[in-house]
């Protein structure tokens, strides 16, 4: 039996709807996931690999200095009063060099190189980098703290060395131009021939003090970031490429060939998470991210906070903090022992940086309240001082990131050195940095074209086809129903007939009464 044309159309529309449902809700997600697995892995000649090797735009590197306004009082034991100056804005360009792929275990090795360019136009109003700030002397306080911890009896001799190296300092503070401290370097005079200065300078050179370069005529140059600017980091990092398993993409598995650190205790020496420049796709709100920071020798585990959006793209915000080492069992292995952990919100960096520094969030956000009480002039704000990253969850792309950390030092109080015998002995801030990322319009458009536009097109098409199928189904049902009604109305069936047949009379003539339809004549009754 041949189908009528309207019914054929209806069935065709239902077929289109069924295809839309199967493709849009079943096949396309599988295809998209498969394609993303290929695109997000660190395969050669992919966009992700190219951006991973050399980020094609500058990151925002901002430095905020703390200027101390009551030095004389601090030297007598008073609480420090500080005033924040900044930001001093730098364009930071990142690249990876000496890259080698290892197909056998799906890994890749590389070294890092960063470039910094000062941007007065993006810095705080009127800041040129030539401003002189007053702050605790990093070298003198660091050396005094190390000697006090290891050989306190040597503090007196160290004081004599300071007199020679730093020209009879009157206090434990430095007056220095910001750019000199950050990058250009400050000169340390190690040309003195007296025993104490010479012994200290020899020890500095032998130990290879952090941030120190050595120049002719026994002149040392110290800066916070100068050695990083344009210099290849000597450490060789090994990460997973994610070709075999995209969920492992960027995961750090070794540094300098070692599969774990020898800095901390137990589990804290393990490399957990990615290198911080790439993350796995298909993130959900329940996923806790992990990234390893080589600068701080530890992993961070940001957690989901809330839904956000950036340039029209839906994102998930993740946040992190330094942690509470004393009360978090997972973090106690960063301490010499559980009873020797620093206060909440502080991390001791001595073993990592070989300097008696402490990391915290800026302005002691999420830290022990006593830290704020010991310093005047701080005002923590979660929006201004927290760590936050906004991810596009399907691709795992960081759209906006603000990584912030503050460096602190103890104003050491020790009787055996005149310069520090009356200091308050409390933790105090030095400076804090923000490393920021915000994808520009070009890369947001690229992400939309590669991911969201195809997804939206399929979304529209699948609903359109599903709608067409629904219309076809309804149309077919209506057509079938109407056809049956028409056939029923045109069928040759009679109206209902009622007959009454009484007994035959004596003349054998029938006596009946019949009603057929709507008769125009009255019924005839034969007696």
Swiss-Prot record:
Which Gene Ontology biological process is one annotated for this entry? Answer: sensory perception of smell
Instruction: Give the principal location in a single coarse category.
Output: membrane
Kindly report every residue range on the membrane side named Cytoplasmic. 1-10, 478-527
Signal sequence annotation: none
Glycosylated residues are: 67, 229, 440
GO MF annotation terms: scavenger receptor activity
Question: How would you describe this protein's topology in the membrane?
Answer: Multi-pass membrane protein
Q: Which cystines does this chain contain?
A: 268-333, 297-352, 335-341
Q: So which stretches are on the Extracellular side?
A: 32-456
InterPro entries, per this entry?
CD36_fam
Q: List where in the cell it is found.
A: Cell membrane
Keywords assigned by UniProt, alphabetized: Cell membrane, Disulfide bond, Glycoprotein, Membrane, Olfaction, Receptor, Sensory transduction, Transmembrane, Transmembrane helix
* Gene Ontology cellular-component terms listed: cytoplasm; plasma membrane
Membrane-spanning segments: 11-31, 457-477
Name the tissues where it is expressed: Principal component of the olfactory cilia membrane. Localizes to the antennal tissue with two to three fold higher expression in males compared to females.
Function as written in the Swiss-Prot or TrEMBL entry: Plays an olfactory role that is not restricted to pheromone sensitivity.
Family of this protein: Belongs to the CD36 family.
Return the protein name.
Sensory neuron membrane protein 1
Q: Which organism is it from?
A: Ostrinia nubilalis (European corn borer)
Name the gene.
SNMP1
